[in-house]
Structures are given as structure tokens and as C-alpha cells.
Amino acid sequence: MTDTTAQHVVDTVANAAATPEREQPFAALGLKPDEYASIREILGRRPTNGELAMYSVMWSEHCSYKSSKIYLRQFGQKVTPAMKKNLMVGMGENAGVVDIGEGWAVTFKVESHNHPSYIEPFQGAATGVGGIVRDIISMGARPVAVMDQLRFGAIDEPDTAHVVHGVVSGISFYGNCLGLPNIGGETYFDPVYQGNPLVNALSVGVLRHEDLHLANASGVGNKVVLFGARTGGDGIGGASILASDTFSEGGPTKRPAVQVGDPFAEKVLIECCLELYRDKLVEGIQDLGAAGISCATSELASNGDGGMFIELDSVLLRDPSLTAEEILMSESQERMMAVVKPELLDQFLAVTAKWDVETSVLGEVTGTGRLVINWHGEEIANVDPRTVAIDGPVYERPVAYPSWIDALRADSASALALPVSGDALREQALALLGSANLADKSWITDQYDYFVGGNTALAFPDDAGMIRVDEESGLGFAIATDANGRYCQLDPKEGAKLALAEAYRNVAASGAVPAAVTDCLNFGSPENPEVMWQFSQAVEGLSDACLELGIPVTGGNVSFYNQTGDVPIFPTPVVGVLGVIDDVARRIPAGWQDEGENIYLLGITREELDGSAWAATVHGHLGGRPPAVDLAAERRLAETLHAASQQGLISSAHDLADGGLAQALTESVLRFGVGARVWLGDIAERDGVDAASALFSESTARAIVSVPREDDVKFRGLCDGRGVPALRIGVTDAGAGTEPVLEIQDLFAIEVAELRSVHRSTLAERFGPVVG
């Protein structure tokens, strides 16, 4: 027998029982010795190679949430009946589903594809988009938009440009080919992400209530069908290796093939699925992402009648040399698995044939409570599917208060030199405007199609993306994502609250009512007790804040092992907030459109410069405590903004966050090129702050709005009645010359042309022409 033939000898269940002492490469597959011992105990024998492959990917950190599960339960525990009222599907499914009225529902979710995007930036990012879109399809929805949250290393590092070009082009390629508008997100640069970029992709879809589908395999005798792209060798072990281990300082030491995406195949798959749903041909459905067939079969069986029989050799292959174990672990893209009644199978196959989507019947649902997999007539797996998909190991990792955090918090920004003169304030405002993190991101966003589909109401650079759902009524949704790793490094509990508060505020500023949350929790190694302390604090803070704001977490993702060597990233919980708007015609943009309107600052300004963009940009400083979170004030502000938009009292709204008032003013000016005259004296007098804090503080629960003069009295009355401090700080104005100007009275003035030049040049100068 040749070596090649020997490699393909099938390890059957009978053989596993007969050879209990055979050594197996469990460690190479990411399993710990005690986990391997648990598998043997569950099975009463050693696992077959196929079973070992299944357990290794499904018990990985990425799939099992074994280090985070004990904390994530808080999201399901800290809820009220009112929070559940409009929640059709919560955590545990492929994506959350929210009732938005008129028989419509929205499903949305954010997930990470961090490690693959470092190994192969283009394909890693592209397949991140494809994977999250399939989660949306699997709920019975039509995907209608995507967003992304990106974190890269220092902007001036040569490797950063390579990763940025690949990631952005991968996202734009896949999303644009699918015909999905990319309506928002954030991009930040920091050396802490140098060896570990974050690529978090969000997708959102719409569906009628009656079209909702879930991932379960119910109905003994129903057929299990795999359809979509053929199965290849790409992504094998991705969940257990790429997403569940750290990178060494020299780069990734384990390099399984990153998945390869085909957006045109996915576009056809979307339309095929929607027709199958319309014709009511699907009983249950699951997309194939992390862990591939291992995940789809075990999860469908666990959530249904508990049993399934699969003929693995019926899987259509791109590479006929793949072993059974490789087929089980493959993460080839653009694949779905459906459960179909036998009497509807011919109709199902006719629809997939119409769309030229390759389809194979793999097996059927059984009532045995076992997942049995055969390979060329021999049994290679016989497991309780719940032990694979649900009842995996759960760890309560050691938690330790970081040894360095007290010193970091003691190093407050209050000791930093503040600008006093008008010239110094002007110089520093421009420095922030042109800094890597606050500069215009159109070099990135212009590679995305914002308006494909014709239903985009708001997109970059507005505070939230907004999509019209119903053409007749104007019903729509808004969505915003936010994160601030610098705040979380100072205080992960308060930092997570701040991320939620900003996304909540952004949605409210668009005119929508915040309704639900998704999150992607990006952290270092869970084997580091200090990282686990950060994680536990962030989850506690986020769950507490959701409860106080009255909006439920519908699902999301945890991404651990984001570190290079022993250096973890900043804790970076990404929070997405979905809001509902009854008519997108009432949407509010984040910039001034008309001259002669009054500019109001809503909320109170405090001397809060710790962790700020000003401290980082001007002084290279990180220390102290993040801004105080006042969720009651956030709620009052959101309700006021919504009421003002409904009554037509405001023509623009922009939240205050990174860069404070200075950044919000310049972005509002640049949105439509309308200048402004602003005075800071009343802020200083009322709030007791100096000019620098008035401009650069990042105090929360604040926004600036523009109000037509004829609505001024009504608007003031609205704010007074709702307990929201409102201070008139300026007017929109063309300026005395031919060029619009942003004038901070008695301090400085900057022409809009200069603001635009500074704001737009940073990324283009650093990254050059768009590649591809």
C-alpha cells in the first residue's frame, strides 16, 4: 500500500472502538488534553478522526464560547418584559429579529473576521462580509445593507497600508457585487492593532413576519439538503486555529487556507433562498460558516428532533482528493443546508436548478437522538449532536485586576498643557481634524456603494445609516455602530457603556427610536486573567446599560486571542444599535443645509479630556478615567431628538463624541459646505469650563442641532419640558467673504476650504491611489 493510499484509510466507529490506545493529533487541532479526555468519556471510546475533527472545530473558542458563556448569560438575564415586546428572535439563533411594525421585521448581526483578515486581507475581509450576509439569509430575510468596524495599526507603518488596501478592497468587492449598500461604520488606527487588525462586519435584512425561518431539523424523515458552492479545501480548521489562537510576534505560525469568496455565487444563492422561502419549501435552514458541515449538521440536529443521518460522500466537491475529515471541517463559502419535507423535495430541487445552484441530498432527519455520518458506506461518526454543538466545555477562567491599571488611571490629562490663545486653539482644532482617526474616511467609503438598491436614506458621513423598508408608508430603520478601545483600556466597564451610549445617540440623532442591540466583543487571550477581567467588566457594563436604556441584546459574537505575542489589543467591544423610524422622510442629516438657523448645544459640558482624541493627538497621551456615563441623560436626549424630528423643529443633528464640540462643528460645516458663527462664552459661563474644554471635552449625552428661527420658541419649550439643557451657541452663516467660514467668535476663524483640505488629505496622502 502506498503512503497516499494509507492517508485515505477511513477511521470508522468500529475501528475506533477496536483501537482505543491509538494516538490522535488532538493538540494540533486546538484541543486541550482534558477536552480530549472529555470527548473519550462522552463517547465511551476514542473518537474517530471524523469525530475528532467535529469536536475540535465545534469546541473551539470561536464556536463554543467556552470562555465567555458564563458572562454572556447576563444579556438574557437583565431584561424586562418591555424589552422583549418587539423581539421576535433573540440570542442563540443566526441573527436577532426585531418587529418594526406594519408586519415587517428586521434581522441584524455583527461578527468578526479578524484573524483571516491579517493572514489574507482581501479574502479575509470579503468572506467576513459573505458570512454575515448568509446569517441574515438563513433567517428568511433579504439582506439590504452592510456596515463595518475596522481597526488597523499605526497609519505610518508600511504594513498598515498593505492590510488597509486588502481589507477595504475585499469589503467593497464583495458588498458591491452583492448589490448591498455599505451605509456606515468606523475606521481607527492605533499601534496596538499592528499585528492584529479588527474587521467586524455587520449585515441587516428585512422580512415579513410570516417569512421567519429558524435553524432546526424537525420532522423525522425530512431530507437534509446541501446547496450552493462546491466544497473545497479552503478554510479548513479556521474556527479552531485562526480564530482561537494568538499570533506569534513573527506572524501567524498556523496558516490554514483562508476562505475564498465568490460574491456572484452568493448573490444567486440569496435569490434562490428567497424563492424557496416564498414557495414555503424549507422547514429549517442553516448557513455554512465557521466549522462548515460539522456546525450545520450538529446545530440543526440539536435544535430539532435530535437525530440525523448523513451520507458524506454525497457532498459535491471542488477537490475530489479531500478526506472525510477535511470535508467536515471545510469552511468553503456560499453554502447552505436546508431541511425539506420529502413531498416537497422535487419542487425544492426544481428551484435550485432554475437558479443553477448545485444541490445534493445528504441524508434525513431521524428520531434516534444521534448524528450518524457515513462515508462510502462506513460509519465514521456516531455522536449525540448536543455534545458537539451545545454541551461543550464551559470555563470559568481566572480573573485578575490588571497590575498596571491604577498607574494608568492616575496619569490624568488634567496635567497636560491646554491651549489658551486663539491661534493655539485653531492649530489644535486643525490637528484633530486631520488626525488619522478623525480625518475624512472617504478614501475608504468612496470604494463602497452607498445607494445601490434605491432605499438608502442616510449613509456616510451621517451619524447613522438609514434604509427605507416600505415604499408606501416610508417605514424604515436606522443603524449605527461604535467602539472606543482607548476608553475601554482605561475602564472596560464604563467604556462598554460609552460605546452603547454613542451608538444609541447616533441612532437618535438620525430621527429614529433605538430598539435593539448587537455586539462584537474583541479582546485578547482568555488565558490571560487580566484580559478576562477586562472582558467580564465590559459585559457587565454593557448588559447593565442595555437594561437601563431598555433595549435588548439580540446576539453577536466574541472574538478572543486578538494579540501578538503577549501584547493584547485594547479591549474593543463593538456595539451596534438598531432604531425604527416611521417615515424616512423625517430623517435628520448630520450637517447644516441652510443659512440663518440657530445652532443649539444640547447637554452639559464638563472638563473631561481623559482618553480623548485631543489628548492622543496633541500630547500622545492615554490615561485617567473616561467621561462619565449618564444613561438617564442619554435617554432624555434621545427622546427629545426624536420628538423634535417628528415635529419638524430641527433640520440637522450631530452627536458629540471623539474630538468634542470642535470636531462636531467642523463636520457639520463640511457636510453641506454651510459656515457658522459660534460663541463659547455661554458654555464657559453655564458649565464652568475654559475654551479648550468647551471645544475638546468628550462629555457624553450631547448633540448639536440647527433650528429654523421660526421654530426656536417651540424647540426651547420642548427641551425645557423634557429636562434637556439647551444652549444657543451660534448661527449658520455664509461668512462675510466669498468663502464660507467656521468662526469661533473672538478666538479664530477657518475657511471651509481649508477645513476640507485638512480633513480630506490624510488618508489619500498616506495610502495613495485606490488599488483594484
Curated annotation (Swiss-Prot):
Query: Which EC class heads this enzyme's classification?
Result: ligase
Report the subcellular localization: Cytoplasm
Active-site residue list: H62, H113 (proton acceptor)
Q: Which UniProt keywords apply?
A: ATP-binding, Cytoplasm, Ligase, Magnesium, Metal-binding, Nucleotide-binding, Purine biosynthesis
Describe the reaction catalysed, as an equation.
Answer: N(2)-formyl-N(1)-(5-phospho-beta-D-ribosyl)glycinamide + L-glutamine + ATP + H2O = 2-formamido-N(1)-(5-O-phospho-beta-D-ribosyl)acetamidine + L-glutamate + ADP + phosphate + H(+)
Q: What is its EC number?
A: 6.3.5.3
The annotated subunit structure for this chain is: Monomer. Part of the FGAM synthase complex composed of 1 PurL, 1 PurQ and 2 PurS subunits.
Residue sites binding substrate per the record: S112, H113, N114, H115, R134, Q259, E331, S332, Q333, S559
Entry superkingdom: Bacteria
Gene3D superfamilies named in the record: PurM-like C-terminal domain, PurM-like, N-terminal domain
NCBIfam families in alphabetical order = FGAM_synth_II, PRK01213.1
- Family membership: Belongs to the FGAMS family.
Which PANTHER family does this chain map to? PHOSPHORIBOSYLFORMYLGLYCINAMIDINE SYNTHASE SUBUNIT PURL
What is this protein's record name?
Phosphoribosylformylglycinamidine synthase subunit PurL
Question: Which lineage is the organism of this entry classified under, starting from the top rank?
Answer: Bacteria, Bacillati, Actinomycetota, Actinomycetes, Micrococcales
A Gene Ontology biological process in which this protein takes part is:
'de novo' IMP biosynthetic process
Its Gene Ontology molecular function terms?
A: ATP binding; magnesium ion binding; phosphoribosylformylglycinamidine synthase activity
List the Pfam families hit by this protein, alphabetically: AIRS, AIRS_C, FGAR-AT_linker
Biological role stated in the UniProt entry = Part of the phosphoribosylformylglycinamidine synthase complex involved in the purines biosynthetic pathway. Catalyzes the ATP-dependent conversion of formylglycinamide ribonucleotide (FGAR) and glutamine to yield formylglycinamidine ribonucleotide (FGAM) and glutamate. The FGAM synthase complex is composed of three subunits. PurQ produces an ammonia molecule by converting glutamine to glutamate. PurL transfers the ammonia molecule to FGAR to form FGAM in an ATP-dependent manner.
| Natural source organism | Leifsonia xyli subsp. xyli (strain CTCB07)
In the UniProt record, the signal sequence range is none
Q: Name one GO cellular component term.
A: cytoplasm
Binding of Mg(2+) 2 occurs at D135, D287
Q: For Mg(2+) 1, which residues are the binding ones?
A: E111, N557
Cite the annotated pathway: Purine metabolism; IMP biosynthesis via de novo pathway; 5-amino-1-(5-phospho-D-ribosyl)imidazole from N(2)-formyl-N(1)-(5-phospho-D-ribosyl)glycinamide: step 1/2
List residues binding ATP: Y65, K109, D519, G556
